[in-house]
């Protein structure tokens, strides 16, 4: 049975919001979609965990004391949260349709659990957006100011970490004061909200962050690439890596911006596109998390060697880090 869902215009904060689950979806097919997505999310979670383990918990201090990897570790931890929360809550509620009639009634009234999940989901998305700018900026300073790089970041790292954690609040502040509720989504249910401040929609706020971040990443990466090109001894592998990383991020941010434009300005008038674009948005966020991790590993032989040795459990991390001839300080300038 396909169901229609709409909210009353005069609903209060505490009123129950009930719905019937859409039983027209094939539960087996939806479960298969869940398994495929969970597989990708799980791989990303494991890779992020391994990177943190071999960089931040190794016997070698090069990674732990490097400003780039400190910022990147925060980015990885946020990526791990995004993957885990989607596996255990977000995608589970949407695609495991047999759970919908069992669990949905528990969320017809205001739920602290849903509010925390929804708020942290959008906070982490905003965090990932902002972190890419600071990682790009770190790479740029390493190339442009090679002598003073360490001293510069010793002074500004703490303020930047604080700003990194504070800026995403600019996306979720309206959610914090608004009603969060469950609504039918595909064969299961997802989480939405009733805006208390009508103009401050999540889609518009995300769109603003995407556009500003995209512009900054392109400008910063352009400066970095130019600085690499004018080096007396050019590092062509670094130039190629930086170009690829910038292109991938730019395409993903541009794609997410287009989707947010739809949700911000056209969703109500062309609702037949909404289910499709929701799926595309979920996939694009997964791809953003996964692609940055893969690019980072594939373009960093030092880290790749450490990960392989860690997984093989054949040598210690400390010994594996001693084989590289490239100073770790240069790594942030070369890859992400």
From Swiss-Prot:
<feature type="transmembrane region" description="Helical">
    <location>
        <begin position="156"/>
        <end position="176"/>
    </location>
</feature>
<feature type="transmembrane region" description="Helical">
    <location>
        <begin position="133"/>
        <end position="153"/>
    </location>
</feature>
<feature type="transmembrane region" description="Helical">
    <location>
        <begin position="93"/>
        <end position="113"/>
    </location>
</feature>
<dbReference type="InterPro" id="IPR000609">
    <property type="entry name" value="7TM_GPCR_serpentine_rcpt_Srg"/>
</dbReference>
<feature type="transmembrane region" description="Helical">
    <location>
        <begin position="32"/>
        <end position="52"/>
    </location>
</feature>
<dbReference type="GO" id="GO:0004888">
    <property type="term" value="F:transmembrane signaling receptor activity"/>
</dbReference>
<protein>
    <recommendedName>
        <fullName>Serpentine receptor class gamma-13</fullName>
    </recommendedName>
</protein>
<keyword id="KW-0472">Membrane</keyword>
<keyword id="KW-0812">Transmembrane</keyword>
<feature type="transmembrane region" description="Helical">
    <location>
        <begin position="277"/>
        <end position="297"/>
    </location>
</feature>
<dbReference type="InterPro" id="IPR051119">
    <property type="entry name" value="Nematode_SR-like"/>
</dbReference>
<feature type="transmembrane region" description="Helical">
    <location>
        <begin position="210"/>
        <end position="230"/>
    </location>
</feature>
<dbReference type="GO" id="GO:0016020">
    <property type="term" value="C:membrane"/>
</dbReference>
<feature type="transmembrane region" description="Helical">
    <location>
        <begin position="246"/>
        <end position="266"/>
    </location>
</feature>
<comment type="similarity">
    <text>Belongs to the nematode receptor-like protein srg family.</text>
</comment>
<feature type="transmembrane region" description="Helical">
    <location>
        <begin position="68"/>
        <end position="88"/>
    </location>
</feature>
<dbReference type="Pfam" id="PF02118">
    <property type="entry name" value="Srg"/>
</dbReference>
<dbReference type="GO" id="GO:0007606">
    <property type="term" value="P:sensory perception of chemical stimulus"/>
</dbReference>
<keyword id="KW-1133">Transmembrane helix</keyword>
